[in-house]
């Protein structure tokens, strides 16, 4: 796909979440974000959760998995175990918690929070795994606890605090996360929310994320005509876009990772079928299983969803990420590419 190379965006002052307001196009609707005058969204019928294909197509990684921490003989077993783990109710957020549980928090507010957390992860140079895990904590907590919008940022930084302890070699301390909120909250408030989070999640802090499954699927992603680094950055970009959209909670992480791979390959080589037998075997998903998620991700990529949430897009405009957010994807995805390979 052609690349529109643009100069790196000028550095901007990090925005404290409380300063963001009236961002009506963040995800959908015309809500005034983080303002007091707001109508509670009407409940909608719960959609059926996408559980992935039930057909056992087998997982075949062969000898291509080059992670020195993983013995290739056990990669398939580990992948299957993680897929079972992602289906456990205790590790999954409700896909419609905004409508069913929350009274004051909206999907737009969630999008603004996630966008801000991406900025925080960049400023503190946190691992991508920390970002994914923190956002999963936010969604799981909000699935069972009603939260006032004034506490949403507190939940975000407390989730980051726990996730950084879980993933980082040198995790940030409480004072760092208080500082990142411009002292909106005290250290005592952050620690109290941390304790509440741990109690709510019953100390089940380890969960497979989209980032987890991307590592497995990339192991069998073969395309000699595409620079490996460019593909990886594009896949990471699309995966982080999925974090912004509340609608992606409908899909399990392994399906999102497979859809990200599908869309990244289509973006780079739109005239070639993006799926293959090898990818189908390793992911456990056929092309048709990915269709709904791929189309949602494509809308995010095109800016038709979450267009005003800029942190992820700005991050991947940088030359060190090969400017992958400036790639021009096809405006529409043909139905034919979802046919079986």
From Swiss-Prot:
PROSITE patterns: CYCLINS
UniProt superkingdom: Eukaryota
UniProt cross-references to SUPFAM superfamilies, sorted A to Z: Cyclin-like
Pfam families, per database record: Cyclin_C, Cyclin_N
UniProt keywords, alphabetically: Cell cycle, Cell division, Cyclin, Mitosis
Gene Ontology BP terms: cell division
Family as reported in the entry's similarity comment: Belongs to the cyclin family. Cyclin AB subfamily.
Role this protein plays: Essential for the control of the cell cycle at the G2/M (mitosis) transition. Interacts with the CDC2 and CDK2 protein kinases to form MPF. G2/M cyclins accumulate steadily during G2 and are abruptly destroyed at mitosis.
Protein name: G2/mitotic-specific cyclin C13-1
